[in-house]
C-alpha cells in the first residue's frame, strides 16, 4: 500500500488522540504502538509531523503521542536510521523546551523519548542536549533532567562526557536563582555521581578503563562547595532535601583530605535535617553513604561525632513503624544500615550507647534499642563475639517488661542470640525461660488497648512469634540441642506454663528424637542430681491430664501423647512395646474427629483404658504407688481447670484399682479429707474416682466412705445451743452431696455379684443418712437442690446397676416404695412449666428402674407417680418463634438452648420408658385403658403442645402393648370403640405431629383387636396397613385434603370395627364435636358421616335422631360437621323434585353462602340424582347468553363485558355439586359435555366482570365495613373445571396444572392460551381415554361465532398433537384435517395456533411426519408468507415449526423448498424483535444440518451470506439469540467444507462453555482467510453494514471482525478491500457515543497497518 495510505491511517489515529475518555486515549496510544511494530519509521515520522504541524494541540494529547513514540523507539531502536533519529531528537528537544514553565507529564514524555533514543544514538542526543547546555547560559531544567536520566540509562555512554558537562555546569550553579532550578541541578549531580560510581565499579566492562575518580574530584568538590555552603544555607525545604540526597553519592567522589576536612561540618548539618523533614528516608540514605565514605578513608572525625550520630540514629529507629507507610519502613532499613557501619568501626562505643537504653521504661526507646541490638547481632557478628556476656547481662530489665511490643522485640533478639551462640553462655537459660513464658501467655494478656499511634498486634501476636521461635530454634540451630535438652522438661509440670505445652512438647519430641538417633539405647533423661527435672511419674501424670481435652491449646493432646511415646523408655522400660502400638491408635482417633465431633466420654474412656493397660504391663506395686502419689500431689494444680481435674480424679481411681488395699485405703481417706467440697464441679470427679476404684476394691471403698460418714465431719450436735459451733449448713450439704454421689458411682462400678447383698444396707441406707440430718433427734430432709440432684443421680445409678444384674428379677427391694415416694416428692418440688435441672429426668429414670423390681407398687402409688410425671413433663411450655403459626410451633420446651432442648427430649424418652415399665405390671386391655385414662385429659387439652406429647406417649404405649401382649385365649376388647373415638378426632389436630401419632394409635388399636380375636402377631391386615399410607395426607395444610384423609381413615375404621363397638365409637365422636380444637371437631363430624354412610344400616333406629340433632345445629352455627348432617334431608327432597330444587337453589343470592353450598353438595350423594342435576346446570350454562357488553361510562371507548347472572349461578352450583366426592359417577357420565362446556365457559369469562347487581352489592358491603366474598366469573369457571376433573378421576391433571401454574394462566388474558395448552398436555398425559369424545365436541366449536372459543378449542386441539395418545386412539388424521381446515381463519391467533399444532406432530407422532410432510411444509411456508399479520407472529410460529419438522420430513420434500425457506428467513436475522432473531437463526442452523447431503453446493451461497450476521450476533444482548448463533455456526461448519473451521466452531461454541469472543473471532478469521481468500471483500462489506447496528455490543464486534479479517489476509487479497470505504466507516465509529465501540474501532485501525 502506498505511503499516502500509511500517512492517512496514522493521521486518523493521531486525530483520535483528542478523545476525551482516558481509556480511548490509551487505546489510541496502543494502536500507534501496534502500527509502530511493523512500520516504526513511518509511525514515528507521522507523529513527528503531526506534532510539528499542530502547534496548538493541547499538551495532554501531545503527551500521549510522545509516549507512543517512546515505546516505538524503545522497541525498535536498532531499526532506526540516523535521519529519523535526528528528526525525533530535534522534535523531542523542542517539545521538552518549548515552554519555560514546567509541565511535568508533557516534558517528561519528551525527555523519555530522548533517553530512549540515547540508548543507541548517544552522540546525537548529547550533541542536541549540549547545544542547549552552553557555558554562561542557564539551561532549561528539562535539559539538565534529561542529561541526568541519560547518565543512569547509558552509564558507559555518558560518563566520558561528564568531565566537560561538570566543568560547564559548575559556573551555572552560581547563576541559578530559583529553587526549582537548583533542585534540578542537585538531582543531576546525584545521578552523575551515581553513574560515575557505577562506571568505576565496572571498569572491566567500561569502554575506557583509564577513567579514575580523581578526574571528577575537583568539579565534584566545587559543586559540593556551592551546594553545601550556599544552597543548603538559604534554600527552601525541597531544595535542602535535594542537596542532602546529592551529598551522599558525591561524598564518595570527594578527595580524601577534603572529605576529612568537611566531615565536622557535614555530619551535624545532615543530622539536623532529621528535625526539619518528615520524609527522613532520603536523609538516612545519604547519611549512610557519607558514613561509608568516611569509613573507607579511615576518617577520625567519626569518633568525635559518634555520640551525636548514635543519638540521632537511635531517635529515628524509635519512631513508631506504621505498616501502611513504606517510607517509614525504608527509613528504618537505611538507619539500620548506618548502625551496621558504626558497629563495624566502633563496636564498644555502640554498645556503651545502646545497652543503657535497655534500662529505660519508655516503650519506644526500649523497642528501638532492641531492634538495633538484634540487627547488630546478626550484621556484625564478628565484632559482637566478645561482647556476648555483656549483652546477655543487659537483657535483665527488658525480660521483665510487660509491654507486648517490647516482648515481641525481646523474642526477636533472643532468636538472633540463639543463632549466634549467646544462649550457650551463662544466663542463656533465662532467655529460654522467657520464650517459654511468652508461649504460655493467656489470650487476655495479648490484647492491649491500642492508642492512636500504636501498632496492632492481633495478626502478629507475641505468643505466635514465641511459639514459632521456640520451634525454629529447637529444630534448626544444632548447637541449641544441649541447651534445651533436658532443660525444657522443667516447664512441663508447672501450671503457669500450661498454654506453652503444645509448642514445648513439639520441641521436646524433636530434641528427643535427635538424641535417640545419636544414641539409640541410652536413657534420654539424665537426672544426675538435677532436682528441677520432673520425675517420670510427674511427666506421665501431667501429660495424661492435659490430654483429656486434646484440642485445647493448639492441640496439646496430640503433642502430649507424642512426647509420652518418645519418653516411654524413661517412664518405664516395660512400656515401650505397648505404647508404640497404643499411642498411634489414640492419635489416629484424634485425626478422625474435630473438637466439635469428638465424643468426650469416649475419648476419656480410651485414655483410661490406655492407663489401665499400662499399669497392667508395668505390674509393679511400688511404681504404681509412686504414680498414685504423684497424681494426688498434682490434683490441687488443676483447681482452676475443673474438667481436667475431674479426669485426673478418674486417673487416680484407675491407678488405685491396680494398687494394694493398704494404699487404696490410705489415698481414699486423703482424697475425702482434702477434696474441695465447696466446688460442686469437683464432686463428679471425686465420685468417679471412688466408682472406678470400687471395681477392684469394693469393700475398701465402702469402708472408707462409711468411716468418713461416721466421722465428725458430718456429725451435727443434738443440742440447739451447739448449732452454730459447727460448720455452716451449706458447707455440710456440699460434703453430703459429694458423698451421696460417691455411693452412686460405687454402686455403678461395683461387681454385680457383690452389689445386691450390699445395696440396701450399705448404699441406700448411707445415702439416706447423708441426705437427712437430725436436729434434736428429729430427722430433717434438706431442701438443697444440689443435694437432691446428687441423691436422684445416685439412686438412679444404683437401681440401674441392680437391674443390670443377672439376679435382678428375683431381687426384693424393701425400700422400693420409700424410694419411689421420695422421687415423686422431688418431681413435685421442681417448679412447673419449665425445665432447668435434670432432676425430673434422673428421678423418673430412677423410678423406671425401681418399677421393674419387686414388689409391685400399690395402685394409688402408681397413679400418683404417673400423675406427677405427666403433670410436670406435659406442662413445659413450648418455644414459639416469631411468625410461627400454631401448627408450626415446636413442641420443644422454652429453655433457650440446645443443651436444655436435649435434656427435655431425654426426659420425654425416660417418661415413655417409665410408663411402659408400669404397663408391664398389667398387660391387659383394662390395664391399657387405665394408662390411657391418665393421658386422656392431656389428649383433649386446649394446648397443642400438651396434646402432641400426650398422643405421642399414647402411640408409644399402644405399640409397646401390642408388641408385648401375650394371648393364650380369646379376650374381648370391650373398650375398643371408646379408645378409637378418643384418638380419631386427633387425626385433624392443628399440630401435624399429633395427626401422625393419632393414626399410629388407631393402627395399633386395630391390630390389638385382631390379636384379641385370635390373629397371629405377625399377621398383616391390608385395611390396617392402609392407615399408614394416609399419614402423608395429614401433613398437608389444605383442610380439604386433611378432612378427605380423615374420611378415608373413618372408612378403614368402619371396615374393621366390630358391630357392637360402633355405637360406642359414634357416641365418643359426638362428644368430640365440642372439642376445643376446631379441626378435631370437624374431623369428628366427617368421621360420623362416613360411618353413617358405611355402616348406617346397622343403626337404622338411630339415624333419625342423629339427623335431627345435626339439622338443629345448622340453625346455630356454620361449623362443617353440622352442615354435613343437613345434606341427608336435601338429598331426600331432591330425589323427588330435582328440577324444582335446582331452580330454587339457583335463585339464591350470589355468591352462595355456606348453607347453600352445603345443600348443593348434598345433591351429589347419589349418582343418578347427581347426573340429573349436572344435566340441568349444563343446560343453563350453554343455552343462555354468555355475557353482555355495556359501557360503564358514557365516554368509555370500549364496552365492558359483564357476565349474565343465570350462567354464572349455574357455574357456581356446578362447582359445588362436582366438589362433593359422591358426584364422581355422575361427572364421569357427563364428563365430555362438562369438560368442554366449562373450558369454553372459562374462555368466554376471561376479563369479564361480575353482573352489575353483584358489583353494587360488593360496594355496599365495603362501605358498611362488612366482609363480602367477591365472585369473579372466570375464577368460578376454573374452579368448576377443577372440581369436574377431580371428580372425574383426573386428580393428576389438577395437580399437574397446579404445579405448572396452569390454572392461574387460564384466568388471565395474557396467559390463557398457554393455560389451555398446559391443560391439554395434562389431559393427554393423564386422561387419554377421555379425549375422543372431548375432541368430537371441540370440533363442533371450531366454527363458533366467538373468536375466544375458536382460539381456546384450537389451542387445546393443537397441543394434543404433541402427545402420542392421539395416534394411539387413531385420532391423528381427523385432528390434522380439522386443524388444516382452519388455516384460513380470519383470526391470526387461530392461524398461529394451527401452525403450532401441526408442528407438535413431531413430538406426538414423529413416525407420521414423513407421511404428511408435503402438507406440513406447505402449511409452514404459507405461514412464512402470511401477509395479514403485522407483528409476524404467524411467521414466527412457522419458523419454529419448520425447525421442529426439519429432522423428520422427507428429504426430497425438504430439498425442494430449502432455498425458498433460507431466503425467506434471512431478513429476520436482524429483526428488532429478539424472538424473530433467535428463531430464524436457529432455523438457519437446522437448514444447514439438513443440508449436509447432496445440496451442499446449492446451499453454500446462503451459508456464506449468513456467516457475518451469525458471528456478530454472538455479541447480541439477548442470550437466546447468542445460543441460536452458537448452534447455527456449529451446523454451518460442515457445509463450509473446511475441517479446521468446523473444528473451531465445535470447540468454542459448545453450549455451557464460556466463549472468549476475541480469541474465537481471531481463530475463525484466520481459517476463513486461509481457505476462502476470495470472500474477503464480501465479508468486509457485510461487516460494514453492522457498523450502524442499534446494539452497542454488535457495533463493537463489527470492527473486531474487520480487524481480524485484515490481520489474517494475504497481500494478494488487498484488491478485494475498499480501503476508502473502510477507513471512512472506521472514522465514523471513532465518533460513536459508546466507548467500547470507539475502542474497538481504534484497535482495528491499528491492524490496518498491513495495508501500509
From Swiss-Prot:
Gene Ontology, cellular component aspect: cytoplasm; lysosomal membrane
MF GO annotations: membrane destabilizing activity
Protein name (Swiss-Prot/TrEMBL): Maestro heat-like repeat-containing protein family member 1
Gene3D superfamilies according to UniProt: Leucine-rich Repeat Variant
Keywords: Lysosome, Membrane, Repeat
Family the entry assigns: Belongs to the MROH1 family.
Lineage start: Eukaryota, Metazoa, Chordata, Craniata, Vertebrata
Record's function text: Lysosome fission factor. Recruited to lysosomes by RAB7 (RAB7A or RAB7B) at scission sites and homooligomerizes to mediate the constriction and scission of lysosomal tubules. May sever membranes by inserting amphipathic helices into one bilayer leaflet. Lysosome fission is required to maintain their steady-state number, shape, size, composition and function, and to accomplish regeneration.
Main subcellular localisation: membrane
Location(s) in or outside the cell: Lysosome membrane
Keyword Thylakoid found: no
GO aspect biological process, one term: lysosome fission
Subunit comment: Homooligomer; homooligomerizes at lysosome scission sites.
Annotated HEAT repeat ranges: 3-41, 260-300, 344-382, 385-423, 1369-1407, 1410-1448, 1616-1652
Coiled coil: none
Domain of life: Eukaryota
Amino acid at each position: 500500500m502506498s505511503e499516502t495510505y500509511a500517512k492517512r491511517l496514522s493521521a486518523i489515529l493521531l486525530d483520535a488522540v483528542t478523545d476525551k475518555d482516558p481509556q480511548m486515549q490509551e487505546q489510541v496510544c496502543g494502536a500507534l504502538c501496534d502500527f509502530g511494530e511493523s512500520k516504526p519509521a513511518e509511525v514515528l515520522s507521522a507523529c513527528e509531523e503531526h506534532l510539528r504541524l499542530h502547534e496548538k494541540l493541547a499538551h495532554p494529547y501531545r503527551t500521549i503521542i510522545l509516549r507512543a513514540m517512546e515505546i516505538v523507539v524503545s522497541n525498535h531502536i536498532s531499526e532506526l536510521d540516523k535521519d529519523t533519529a535526528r528528526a525525533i531528537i530535534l522534535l523531542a528537544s523542542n517539545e521538552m523546551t518549548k515552554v519555560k514553565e514546567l509541565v511535568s507529564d508533557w516534558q517528561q514524555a519528551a525527555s523519555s523519548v530522548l533517553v530512549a533514543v540515547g540508548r543507541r544514538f548517544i552522540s546525537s542526543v548529547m550533541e542536541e542536549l549540549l547545544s542547549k547546555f552552553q557555558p554562561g547560559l542557564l539551561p532549561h531544567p528539562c535539559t539538565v533532567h534529561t542529561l541526568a536520566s541519560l547518565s543512569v540509562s547509558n552509564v558507559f555512554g555518558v560518563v566520558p562526557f561528564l568531565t566537560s558537562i561538570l566543568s560547564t555546569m559548575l559556573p551555572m550553579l552560581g547563576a541559578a536563582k530559583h529553587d526549582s532550578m537548583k533542585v534540578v541541578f542537585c538531582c543531576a549531580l546525584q545521578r552523575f555521581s551515581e553513574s560515575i560510581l557505577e562506571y568505576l565499579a565496572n571498569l572491566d566492562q567500561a569502554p575506557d578503563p583509564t577513567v579514575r575518580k580523581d578526574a571528577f574530584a575537583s568539579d565534584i568538590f566545587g559543586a559540593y562547595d556551592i551546594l553545601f555552603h550556599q544552597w543548603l544555607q538559604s534554600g527552601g525545604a525541597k531544595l535542602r532535601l535535594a542537596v542532602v540526597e546529592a551529598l551522599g553519592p558525591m561524598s564518595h567522589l570527594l578527595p580524601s583530605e577534603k572529605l576529612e576536612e568537611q566531615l565536622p561540618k557535614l555530619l551535624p548539618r545532615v543530622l539536623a535535617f532529621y528535625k526539619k523533614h518528615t520524609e527522613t528516608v532520603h536523609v538516612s540514605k545519604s547519611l549512610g553513604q557519607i558514613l561509608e565514605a568516611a569509613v573507607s578513608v579511615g576518617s577520625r572525625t567519626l569518633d568525635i561525632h559518634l555520640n551525636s550520630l548514635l543519638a540521632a540514629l537511635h531517635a529515628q529507629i524509635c519512631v513508631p513503624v506504621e505498616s501502611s507507610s513504606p517510607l517509614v519502613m525504608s527509613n528504618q532499613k537505611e538507619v539500620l544500615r548506618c548502625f551496621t557501619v558504626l558497629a563495624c568501626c566502633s563496636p564498644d562505643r555502640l554498645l556503651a550507647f545502646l545497652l543503657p537504653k535497655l534500662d529505660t521504661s519508655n516503650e519506644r526507646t526500649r523497642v528501638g534499642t532492641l531492634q538495633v541490638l538484634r540487627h547488630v547481632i546478626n550484621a556484625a557478628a564478628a565484632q559482637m563475639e566478645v561482647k556476648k556476656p555483656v549483652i546477655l547481662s543487659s537483657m535483665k530489665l527488658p525480660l521483665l517488661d510487660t509491654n507486648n511490643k517490647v516482648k515481641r522485640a525481646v523474642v526477636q533478639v533472643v532468636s538472633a542470640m540463639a543463632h549466634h551462640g549467646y544462649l550457650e553462655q551463662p544466663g542463656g537459660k533465662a532467655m529460654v525461660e522467657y520464650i517459654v513464658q511468652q508461649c504460655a501467655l493467656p489470650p487476655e494478656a495479648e490484647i492491649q488497648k491500642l492508642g492512636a499511634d500504636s501498632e496492632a498486634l492481633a495478626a502478629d501476636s507475641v505468643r505466635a512469634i514465641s511459639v514459632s521461635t521456640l520451634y525454629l530454634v529447637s529444630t534448626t540451630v544444632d548447637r541449641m540441642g544441649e541447651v534445651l535438652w533436658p532443660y525444657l522438661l522443667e516447664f512441663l509440670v508447672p501450671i503457669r506454663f500450661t498454654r506453652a505445652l503444645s509448642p514445648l512438647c513439639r520441641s521436646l519430641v524433636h530434641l528427643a528424637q535427635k538424641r535417640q538417633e545419636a544414641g539409640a539405647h541410652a536413657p534420654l533423661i539424665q537426672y544426675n542430681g538435677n532436682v528441677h527435672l520432673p520425675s517420670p511419674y510427674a511427666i506421665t501424670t501431667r501429660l495424661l491430664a492435659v490430654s483429656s481435652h486434646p484440642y485445647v491449646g493448639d492441640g496439646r493432646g496430640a503433642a502430649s501423647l507424642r512426647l509420652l511415646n518418645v519418653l516411654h523408655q524413661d517412664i518405664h522400660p516395660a512400656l515401650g512395646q505397648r505404647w508404640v502400638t497404643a499411642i498411634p491408635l489414640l492419635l489416629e482417633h484424634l485425626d478422625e474427629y474435630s473438637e466439635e465431633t469428638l465424643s468426650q466420654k469416649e475419648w476419656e474412656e480410651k485414655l483410661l483404658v490406655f492407663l489401665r493397660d499400662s499399669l497392667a504391663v508395668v505390674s509393679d506395686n511400688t511404681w504404681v504407688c509412686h504414680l498414685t502419689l504423684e497424681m494426688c500431689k498434682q490434683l490441687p494444680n488443676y483447681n482452676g481447670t475443673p474438667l481436667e481435674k475431674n479426669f485426673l480424679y478418674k486417673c487416680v481411681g484407675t491407678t488405685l484399682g491396680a494398687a494394694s488395699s493398704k494404699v487404696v485405703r490410705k489415698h481414699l481417706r486423703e482424697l475425702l479429707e482434702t477434696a474441695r467440697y465447696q466446688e460442686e464441679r469437683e464432686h463428679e470427679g471425686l465420685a468417679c474416682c471412688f466408682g472406678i476404684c470400687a471395681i477392684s476394691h469394693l469393700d475398701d471403698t465402702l469402708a472408707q466412705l462409711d468411716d468418713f460418714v461416721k466421722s465428725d465431719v458430718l456429725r451435727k450436735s443434738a443440742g440447739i445451743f451447739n448449732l452454730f459451733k459447727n460448720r455452716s449448713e451449706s458447707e455440710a450439704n456440699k460434703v453430703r452431696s459429694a458423698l451421696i454421689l460417691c455411693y452412686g458411682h460405687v454402686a455403678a462400678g461395683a461387681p454385680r455379684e457383690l452389689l445386691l447383698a450390699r445395696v440396701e444396707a450399705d448404699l441406700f441406707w448411707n445415702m439416706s443418712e447423708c441426705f437427712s440430718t437430725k436436729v434434736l433427734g428429729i430427722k430433717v430432709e434438706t431442701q438443697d437442690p444440689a443435694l437432691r440432684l446428687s441423691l436422684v443421680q445416685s439412686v438412679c445409678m444404683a437401681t440401674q446397676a441392680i437391674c443390670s444384674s443377672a439376679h435382678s428379677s428375683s431381687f426384693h427391694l424393701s425400700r422400693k416404695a420409700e424410694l419411689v415416694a421420695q422421687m415423686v416428692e422431688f418431681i413435685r418440688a421442681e417448679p412447673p412449666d419449665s425445665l432447668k435441672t435434670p432432676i425430673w429426668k434422673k428421678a423418673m429414670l430412677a423410678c423406671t428402674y425401681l418399677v421393674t423390681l419387686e414388689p409391685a407398687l400399690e395402685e394409688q402409688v402408681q397413679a400418683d407417680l404417673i400423675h406427677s410425671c405427666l403433670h410436670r413433663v406435659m406442662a413445659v411450655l413450648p418455644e414459639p418463634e416469631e411468625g410461627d403459626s400454631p401448627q408450626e410451633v415446636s413442641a420443644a420446651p422454652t429453655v433457650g438452648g440446645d443443651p436444655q432442648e436435649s435434656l427435655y427430649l431425654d426426659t420425654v424418652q425416660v417418661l415413655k420408658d417409665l410408663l411402659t415399665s408400669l404397663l408391664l405390671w398389667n398387660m391387659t386391655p383394662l390395664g391399657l385403658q387405665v394408662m390411657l385414662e391418665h393421658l386422656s385429659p392431656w389428649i383433649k387439652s386446649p394446648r397443642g403442645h400438651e396434646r402432641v406429647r400426650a398422643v405421642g406417649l399414647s402411640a408409644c404405649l399402644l405399640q409397646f402393648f401390642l408388641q408385648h401382649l401375650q394371648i393364650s385365649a380369646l379376650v374381648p376388647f370391650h373398650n375398643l370403640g371408646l379408645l378409637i373415638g378418643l384418638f380419631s378426632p386427633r387425626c385433624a389436630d392443628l399440630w401435624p405431629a399429633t395427626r401422625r401419632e393419632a393414626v399410629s394409635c388407631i393402627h395399633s388399636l386395630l391390630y390389638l383387636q385382631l390379636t384379641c380375636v385370635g390373629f397371629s402377631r405377625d399377621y398383616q391386615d391390608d385395611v390396617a396397613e392402609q392407615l399408614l399410607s394416609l399419614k402423608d395426607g395429614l401433613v398437608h395444610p389444605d383442610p380439604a385434603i386433611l378432612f378427605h384423609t380423615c374420611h378415608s381413615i373413618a372408612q378403614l375404621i368402619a371396615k374393621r370395627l366390630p358391630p357392637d363397638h360402633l355405637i360406642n365409637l359414634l357416641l365418643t365422636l359426638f362428644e368430640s364435636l365440642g372439642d376445643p380444637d376446631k379441626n378435631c371437631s370437624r374431623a369428628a363430624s366427617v368421621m360420623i358421616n362416613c360411618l353413617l354412610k358405611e355402616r348406617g344400616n346397622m343403626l337404622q333406629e338411630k339415624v333419625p335422631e342423629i339427623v335431627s340433632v345435626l339439622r338443629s345445629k345448622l340453625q346455630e352455627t356454620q361449623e362443617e360437621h353440622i352442615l354435613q348432617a343437613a345434606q341427608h334431608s336435601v338429598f331426600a327432597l331432591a330425589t323427588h323434585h330435582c328440577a324444582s330444587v335446582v331452580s330454587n337453589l339457583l335463585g339464591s343470592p350470589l355468591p352462595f353462602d355456606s348453607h347453600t353450598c352445603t345443600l348443593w353438595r348434598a345433591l351429589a350423594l347419589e349418582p343418578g340424582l347427581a347426573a340429573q342435576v349436572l344435566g340441568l346446570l349444563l343446560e343453563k350454562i350453554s343455552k343462555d347468553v354468555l355475557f353482555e357488553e355495556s359501557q360503564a361510562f358514557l365516554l368509555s371507548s370500549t364496552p365492558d363485558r359483564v357476565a349474565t347472572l343465570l350462567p354464572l349461578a349455574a357455574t357456581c352450583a356446578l362447582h359445588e355439586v362436582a366438589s362433593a366426592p359422591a358426584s364422581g359417577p355422575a361427572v364421569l357420565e357427563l364428563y365430555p359435555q362438562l369438560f368442554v362446556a366449562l373450558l369454553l365457559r372459562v374462555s368466554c369469562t376471561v376479563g369479564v366482570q361480575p353482573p352489575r347487581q353483584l358489583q353494587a352489592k360488593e360496594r355496599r358491603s365495603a362501605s358498611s365495613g362488612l366482609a363480602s366474598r367477591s365472585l369473579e366469573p372466570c375464577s368460578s369457571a376454573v374452579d368448576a373445571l377443577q372440581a369436574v376433573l377431580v371428580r372425574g378421576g383426573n386428580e393428576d391433571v389438577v395437580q399437574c396444572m397446579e404445579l405448572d401454574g396452569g390454572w392461574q394462566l387460564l384466568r388471565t388474558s395474557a396467559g390463557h392460551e398457554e393455560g389451555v395448552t398446559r391443560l391439554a398436555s395434562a389431559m393427554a398425559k393423564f386422561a387419554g381415554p377421555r379425549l375422543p369424545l372431548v375432541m368430537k365436541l371441540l370440533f363442533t366449536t371450531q366454527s363458533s361465532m366467538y373468536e375466544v372459543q375458536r382460539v381456546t378449542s384450537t389451542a387445546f386441539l393443537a397441543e394434543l398433537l404433541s402427545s402420542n395418545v392421539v395416534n394411539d386412539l387413531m385420532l391423528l388424521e381427523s385432528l390434522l384435517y380439522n386443524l388444516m381446515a382452519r388455516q384460513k381463519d380470519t383470526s391470526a391467533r387461530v392461524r398461529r395456533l394451527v401452525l403450532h399444532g401441526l408442528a407438535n406432530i413431531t413430538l406426538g407422532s414423529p413416525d407420521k411426519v414423513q407421511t404428511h410432510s408435503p402438507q406440513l411444509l406447505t402449511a409452514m411456508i404459507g405461514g412464512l408468507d402470511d401477509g395479514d399479520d403485522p407483528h409476524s407472529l404467524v411467521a414466527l410460529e412457522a419458523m419454529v415449526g419448520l425447525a421442529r419438522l426439519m429432522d423428520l420430513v422427507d428429504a426430497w420434500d425438504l430439498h425442494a423448498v430449502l432455498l425458498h425457506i433460507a431466503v425467506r428467513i434471512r431478513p429476520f436475522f436482524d429483526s428488532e424483535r429478539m424472538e424473530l432473531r433467535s428463531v430464524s437463526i436457529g432455523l438457519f442452523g437446522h437448514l444447514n444440518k439438513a443440508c449436509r447431503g447432496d445440496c451442499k453446493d446449492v446451499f453454500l451461497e446462503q451459508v456464506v451470506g449468513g456467516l457475518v450476521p451469525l458471528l456478530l450476533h454472538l455479541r447480541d444482548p439477548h442470550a437466546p439469540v447468542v445460543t441460536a448463533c452458537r448452534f447455527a455456526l456449529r451446523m454451518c461448519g460442515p457445509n463450509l467444507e473446511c475441517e479446521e473451521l468446523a473444528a473451531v466452531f465445535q470447540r468454542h461454541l459448545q453450549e455451557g462453555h464460556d466463549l472468549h469472543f476475541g480469541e474465537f473471532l481471531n481463530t475463525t478469521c484466520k481459517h476463513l482467510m486461509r481457505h476462502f481468500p476470495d470472500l474477503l471483500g464480501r465479508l468486509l462489506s457485510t461487516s460494514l453494514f453492522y457498523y450502524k447496528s442499534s446494539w452497542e455490543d454488535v457495533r463493537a464486534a463489527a470492527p473486531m471482525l474487520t480487524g481480524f479479517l485484515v490481520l489474517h489476509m494475504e497481500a494478494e487479497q488487498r484488491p478485494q478491500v475498499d480501503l476508502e470505504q473502510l477507513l471512512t466507516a472506521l472514522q465514523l465509529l471513532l465518533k460513536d457515543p459508546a466507548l467500547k465501540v470507539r475502542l474497538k474501532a481504534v484497535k482495528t485501525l491499528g491492524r490496518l497497518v498491513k495495508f501500509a
